[in-house]
């Protein structure tokens, strides 16, 4: 039993309501497949760096999008609505090939490098995730997954800070 919600949640004012209702549509041990645009895509970040957040007829900033998600924010909503992520897939698109390429190309090479430092998912245009109802998962597994995710996020943030400092020091010594 699989329910598809591909490119749906970003069009809803209250996707939480739909996610909670969908749990009634999925048979025990069933799955929900979700895809959403990634608002943390480097092209969007580059546009915002230029002070631009203009809606368009298609793409990341489609004018019909009323909710925006990063991987982390989608994961949080899913967990809060009783869904457990089982498998993530990243739909990667080089920024230079996107509708936001001009914003990216207008940034200096140094600024692009600074933005990308320690950011492995900069080119994720869309996140896809397979989830199952949390009721099908032992409570300890959900808690363990949350703790592991929180620890990994904290570790990544700490490593990023150290990397930035070391990079800055290296650049300073190269002068």
Predicted regions and their residues:
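Heptad-repeat positions
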Residues: 149, 156, 163, 167-170, ...
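Short SAM/SAH-binding signature in class I
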Residues: 1-7
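Conserved Walker B
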Residues: 8-12
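S-adenosyl-L-methionine-dependent methyltransferase catalytic module, highlighting the catalytic core
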Residues: 2, 13-154
